[in-house]
UniProtKB/Swiss-Prot annotation:
Source taxonomy: Eukaryota, Viridiplantae, Streptophyta, Embryophyta, Tracheophyta
Name of this protein: Putative phytosulfokines 6
Post-translational modification: Sulfation is important for activity and for the binding to a putative membrane receptor. PSK-beta is an enzymatic derivative of PSK-alpha.
Tissue spec: Expressed in roots, leaves, stems, flowers and siliques. Most abundant in vascular bundles and in root tips.
Leader sequence segment: 1-20
Propeptide segments, given as residue ranges: 21-72, 78-81
GO terms of molecular function: growth factor activity
GO biological process: cell differentiation; cell population proliferation
GO-annotated cellular components: extracellular region
Listed InterPro entries: Phytosulfokine
Amino acid sequence: MKQSLCLAVLFLILSTSSSAIRRGKEDQEINPLVSATSVEEDSVNKLMGMEYCGEGDEECLRRRMMTESHLDYIYTQHHKH
């Protein structure tokens, strides 16, 4: 009885660990397809109020330029005193 119980528990542990390993391998195949921009860089841009501008999007480029110049102004004013 004890031996069959131990074998059943061992079988369950091995089957769950092998399925978890298989799922991990599948996740690694998906990762290269994720966005090229790192999460950290993206969150910093959002924090600073800067957005990604597509090619030829003049309005977006103006907004980004104003945001960057405003941040530069704040930074230089802080260091003058």
